[in-house]
């Protein structure tokens, strides 16, 4: 079992973990080459392991990496471990990966921001390599699902695709979470857009994931005008009584509001306290 926690640019590896109990989650990310590799474990259970590279198409053309992954930001504090990586792609595009493992809140947030030089049709496939001892159990009517034991008797995590509508009937055909050859795929697309944001909220609190969950995309405003999705996105997540807020600026920065919360930052992950106020877990300016 790996006991180290931290980030080494020289080794191209980061290990994120919320604590040191044997049952705590542990995420390893190897980013020193052109393809990401990952491993997520909880105690003795290995939930996923292998290639973590997204697949992207721009106007039908498959994009190829033109650089290794670069460490853009690493923060480890009392609230979370946070890793941000960036890779350049053919066609002048870039993909930025956010990875946040919250300590007290016990969730993993993984998201890709795809940034293009011109408006284009973007097709995205984010792939998570599940191990043989883990299956994805999709909900019947909504886009959520659970990582479970092979027989489905034990749940390891709740998975919510934040950029997609909660109900399948409200989303575009072909988009959502699906398993292909043992890999959990998140499929999304955007039409005539300069950016796409694809995020997963993965709840690792075993007692909490049995409770009802809901999420929705929020309206981002600037100067009393709605900000389009290629410039900024925001999401609200609720599992049981706990609620969180996520925000990412995708274009030029500005003074914006989200559920009445004012911000000028690039990235925000926050919780709502009992009084309904926003408490930042991680804020990147």
What is each of the regions a protein language model found here?
Residues 190-204:
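Short Pro-Gly-centered flexible turn/kink motifs
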Residues 53, 63, 73-74, 129-131, ...:
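Polar low-complexity intrinsically disordered regions enriched in Ser/Thr and small residues
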Residues 113, 125-127, 137-194:
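Beta-strand/loop-rich accessory regions of lumenal/periplasmic or secreted enzymes
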């Amino acid at each position: 079992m790996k006991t180290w926690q931290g980030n080494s640019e020289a080794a191209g590896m980061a290990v994120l973990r919320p604590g040191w109990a044997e049952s705590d989650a542990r995420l390893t990310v190897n980013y020193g080459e052109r393809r990401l590799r990952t491993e997520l474990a909880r105690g003795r259970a290995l939930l996923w392991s292998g290639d973590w590279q997204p697949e992207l198409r721009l106007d039908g053309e498959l994009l190829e990496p033109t650089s290794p992954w670069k460490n853009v930001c690493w923060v480890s504090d009392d609230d979370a471990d946070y890793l941000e990586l960036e890779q350049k792609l053919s066609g002048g595009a870039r993909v930025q990966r956010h990875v946040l493992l919250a300590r007290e809140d016990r969730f993993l947030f993984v998201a890709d921001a795809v940034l293009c030089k011109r408006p284009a049709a973007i097709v995205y496939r984010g792939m998570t390599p599940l191990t043989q001892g883990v299956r994805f159990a999709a909900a019947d009517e909504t886009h959520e699902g659970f990582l479970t034991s092979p027989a489905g008797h034990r749940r390891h995590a709740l998975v919510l695709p934040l950029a997609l509508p909660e109900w399948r009937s409200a989303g575009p055909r072909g988009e959502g979470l699906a398993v292909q050859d043992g890999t959990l795929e998140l499929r999304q697309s955007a039409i005539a857009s300069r950016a796409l944001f694809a995020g997963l909220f993965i709840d690792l609190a075993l007692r909490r994931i049995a409770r009802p969950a809901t999420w929705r995309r929020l309206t981002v405003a600037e100067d009393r005008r709605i900000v389009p999705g290629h410039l900024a996105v925001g999401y609200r997540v609720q599992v049981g009584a706990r609620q969180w807020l996520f925000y990412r600026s995708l274009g030029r920065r500005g003074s914006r509001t989200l559920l009445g919360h004012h911000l000028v930052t690039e990235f925000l992950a926050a919780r709502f306290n009992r009084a309904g106020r926003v408490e930042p877990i991680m804020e990147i300016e």
